Design a protein with these regions (language model features):
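Membrane-embedded alpha-helical bundles of polytopic integral membrane proteins
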Residues: 1-113, 119-149
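Short helical (or helix-break) motifs at transmembrane helix termini and adjacent helical loops
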Residues: 89-99, 155-166
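Short cytoplasmic-facing helical segments at TM-TM junctions of multi-pass membrane proteins
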Residues: 109-112, 164-168
Length: 168
C-alpha cells in the first residue's frame, strides 16, 4: 500500500516537472482533478452534503475560480469578456426559448424548470453570437463556434449540477 501511495503522489510531481507548471496552473490542474473526482463521487454515491461540508467545499472551490478570473483578466481581457457574454447569452437563450417553446423537461427531478427546447435555444443564440463575432475578430468562425458551444454545454451542465447540489 505504501508503494502505491508513494507512486500516486509521485505521478503529479513528474507531470508538473515535465510540463513546467507554474503556481497558477497547479491550482487550475488541482481544482480540475478535484471537481472531476468530487462530481463522480457525488453522482454515484449516497453521500449527502451537510451545511458545514458545503461551506468548506465552497471555500475551497472559490479560490481556483477567483485565480482563473484574475489570470484571464490580466492576460486577455477580451477573452474573459467573451466567456462572460457567452454565458449570459446561453442563460438568456435558454430562458427565452424555454418559456416560449419549452414542453419537454430536461431533468425534472433535478431542475424542473429546464427544458430541452431551452437548451437548444441556448446553443442557437450562442451560435448566432459566434457568427456575429466572427466579423469583428481575426479568429476563425469554427473556433468561435466551438468555443461558444463548449461554454454553452458547460453552462447548462453547471446549472444542472448546481441544482442537484441545491436539492440535497
Amino acid at each position: 500500500q505504501k508503494i502505491i501511495l508513494w507512486s500516486a503522489s509521485l505521478v503529479p510531481s513528474i507531470y508538473f516537472y515535465l510540463f513546467n507548471f507554474d503556481n497558477i496552473n497547479i491550482i487550475f490542474f488541482t481544482s480540475l482533478i478535484f471537481w472531476l473526482f468530487f462530481a463522480v463521487f457525488h453522482l454515484y454515491s449516497k453521500f449527502h452534503l451537510t451545511n458545514n461540508f458545503n461551506v468548506i467545499l465552497g471555500t475551497i472551490l472559490i479560490v481556483p475560480l477567483w485565480v482563473s478570473v484574475v489570470s484571464l483578466f490580466l492576460d486577455n481581457k477580451l477573452f474573459l469578456l467573451f466567456i462572460f457574454i457567452s454565458i449570459f447569452i446561453a442563460d438568456i437563450g435558454a430562458y427565452l426559448f424555454g418559456k416560449k417553446y419549452g414542453k419537454n423537461k430536461l431533468m425534472p427531478n433535478v431542475s424542473p424548470g429546464k427544458t430541452v427546447e431551452g437548451v437548444l435555444g441556448a446553443f442557437f443564440l450562442n451560435t448566432i453570437f459566434a457568427c456575429s463575432l466572427s466579423f469583428y475578430v481575426s479568429v476563425e468562425l469554427l473556433i468561435i463556434v466551438a468555443g461558444t458551444t463548449l461554454i454553452t454545454f458547460l453552462s447548462v451542465f453547471g446549472d444542472l449540477y448546481e441544482s442537484l447540489l441545491k436539492r440535497q
